[in-house]
Amino acid sequence: MSISRILLAATFAVTVGTAGILITPGTASASALAEGTYRFAFDGSKQTIDGVAKPTGSYSRSIAMRSACPPSGCVATGWDTSIGPTWLQPPEEGALVFRENRDQWVATRWKMFTCNGSIKQGTETLAFQVKPDGTFVGVSTQLEAPCPPIVIPFTATRVGDVSPDVQVADPNTV
């Protein structure tokens, strides 16, 4: 029963979060993202847990990104620099591989969360659209059973070039 409830809640959270992104006008057509370091600002004041508002503190992460648009579709690789400077193959927690589909970029990574007072492995899905000014607007959906899904909106802004000591995978090779 509780697994069914969690799956239903997760489906609802992803659907509602994604729907919010999909109804927001995006760019005219997909193109490679600008290479650089982005500040992802998560708005904790709008966080929901299991679909219920549960405000928390806001926070940010710096993610270094590279992208390419080969004939098979646009791909961006990212590395959460709060983990360290070296990009490691997924499923490393800091590694992100975004794929573009209909002007929406989506990546899922595994991540460690605190759930019911203990550390659990779960997943985080980041989904965003690129606005005309280059800003990303999207949601983070965190799933860690047996706890309910957590959805937090974010914006991301390019803050500079990728630091020379930060390694980000070639998006043409993932």
PLM regions: where:
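Internal, hydrophobic beta-strand segments that form the core of beta-sheet-rich folds
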Residues: 122-144, 153
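Predominantly extracellular/secreted and cell-surface proteins with exposed
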Residues: 56-124
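Edge beta-strand at a domain terminus
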Residues: 140-174
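Tryptophan-anchored aromatic micro-motifs
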Residues: 31-54, 78-83, 136-138, 166, ...
